């Protein structure tokens, strides 16, 4: 069962028998999964709309079951991986499984709208020549 850190608090308070208002806590309790009562089959989302000196570029992703879709904002492309068969994400299956990619794209887009996610936008102070010369993004150091 895939988990994400925001599930930890919900799981701990559930295990402790504490009731909390649903609207105040992100994440889902995994206590029923830990007790063997059920499997979790829900999407897990990542959203990183920023650039980082370490080389990270804006992307969003969703994992549902064995499948993971990554949307790259710079190139406006998607990558699709079957994590059961390819945990290292080496073989992009976007062209081989277009229906699965479209399905996960719809799930991701719906979630981005639901949470009113900030989408990346162009940085008017970005200097491509400086980045190539220094390896750093203009305006971030």
Residue ranges and their predicted role:
Residues 8, 54, 64, 69, ...:
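Long, internal low-complexity/basic segments
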Residues 1, 6-83, 114, 133-134:
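C-terminal cap/loop subdomain of S1 sulfatases and analogous C-terminal strand-loop tails that border
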């Amino acid at each position: 069962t895939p988990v994400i850190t925001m599930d930890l608090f919900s799981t701990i308070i559930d295990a402790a028998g504490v009731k909390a208002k649903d609207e105040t806590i992100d994440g889902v309790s995994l206590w029923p999964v830990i007790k063997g009562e059920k499997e979790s089959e829900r999407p897990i989302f990542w959203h990183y709309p920023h650039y980082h000196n370490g080389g990270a570029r804006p992307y969003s992703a969703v994992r549902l079951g064995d499948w993971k879709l990554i949307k790259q904002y710079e190139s406006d492309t998607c990558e699709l991986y079957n994590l059961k068969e390819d945990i290292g994400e080496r073989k992009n299956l976007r062209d081989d499984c277009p229906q699965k990619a479209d399905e996960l794209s719809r799930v991701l887009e719906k979630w981005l709208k639901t949470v009113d996610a900030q989408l990346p936008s162009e940085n008017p102070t970005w200097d491509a020549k400086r980045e190539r010369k220094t390896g750093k993004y203009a305006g971030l150091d």
